[in-house]
């Protein structure tokens, strides 16, 4: 995995190791390089704004489980609990 992707993944999900590393290491390497390096370096959004957008979209599409999973990652990138509450209230 590319170092940038590895560092970004670790900041988002500290200590998390995907089961795909064992079952399909080629797939997870390609996916991680795409998701955690190419995508995040493709636009002009700062990380905090990106995570605010991700949280709002997940609520908007009723992706509640995914939303819960991304809360800690968003916090790791600077989204505050007050901002998280605001996102939730705006999506109601």
Where are these regions (language model features)?
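Short, structured motif recognition centered on aromatic/hydrophobic residues
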Residues: 49-58, 87-88
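Generic structural signal for hydrophobic core residues of well-folded globular domains
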Residues: 34, 56-62, 91-92
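Acidic, glycine/proline-rich low-complexity segments that act as flexible tails and inter-domain linkers
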Residues: 1-48, 61, 68, 72-76
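Compositionally biased, intrinsically disordered low-complexity segments
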Residues: 43, 90-91
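A cross-kingdom feature marking solvent-exposed beta-strand/loop segments within repeated
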Residues: 68-90
């Amino acid at each position: 995995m590319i170092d940038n992707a590895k560092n970004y993944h670790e900041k988002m999900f500290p200590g998390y190791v995907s089961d795909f590393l064992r079952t399909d290491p080629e797939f997870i390497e390609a996916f991680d390089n795409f998701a955690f390096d190419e995508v995040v370096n493709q636009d002009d959004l700062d990380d905090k704004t990106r995570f605010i957008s991700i949280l709002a979209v997940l609520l908007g599409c009723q992706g509640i489980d995914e939303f819960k999973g991304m809360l800690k990652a968003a916090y790791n990138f600077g989204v505050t609990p007050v901002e998280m509450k605001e996102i939730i209230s705006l999506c109601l």
